[in-house]
Amino acid sequence: RDVLGSRGLGDVYKRQTQIIAAGAPHGNFGSDSDVFCKLVPFWQLELYFGKVLGRTPLQQSDKGGFYPDVYEYIRTHDNLRTAGEQQTEFVYICSLIAKANLLDFFTKWGFLTPVDITVDDYGTGKLTVTQARIDEIRSRVEALGYPKPDVALEYITDNSVELYKDKPGIVAGTATRSGSTFTMTNWKNVAAYEVVDETGKKVCISDGLLAPSGTATFTMKTAWKDGFKVYAVSATGARTAVTF
């Protein structure tokens, strides 16, 4: 948290939503391939399982929790041979410890997207994730039989923890659009805004509110097109159409 805070949480979360919209592999975010963006999904797991559900040493009397149990599992099992195997195994480990099917979350973050690249970060290393390995992990997670989280986990931020605790419905406000810039006024309980094209593919995603305020403004990198739609997304993932 301190590291993310030093970079400006608002900026990191803004770039995070662009990464999810692009569907990029976790090890290859293009212009956003810095360690701070890559840290976001790990922090989101702590926000949800730790701060929302209380599975943290700060709240458990036995000083256990989601991440302590993940670390203990990794400590007591043999290391896998490659970085790609380790990255994908993390999906299984987290689902096992959380007792939740986290495939959707990790898919959106690109952990289960094929990639074959050389990563240069304190030295170079190979990151290869094959479709066969992805299929194996998916099968193993599904075999656990755990339910999916009842929240839009990929959109949780430090500012929306209370939303994810209480899971209130969206209260619609008003919205205006000027070119590719959107201004949302007096919307409440919004975890994120999504702009999708006519096929339903995400074009742009924005934090519901980066800081407590009655107004949220965001700008797409692409031009607005006929057929685009905007949705306000609640903590549960329920979507409310935004009209202008």
Predicted segments with their positions:
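Active-site-proximal alpha-helical
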Residues: K14-T118, Y122, L127-T130
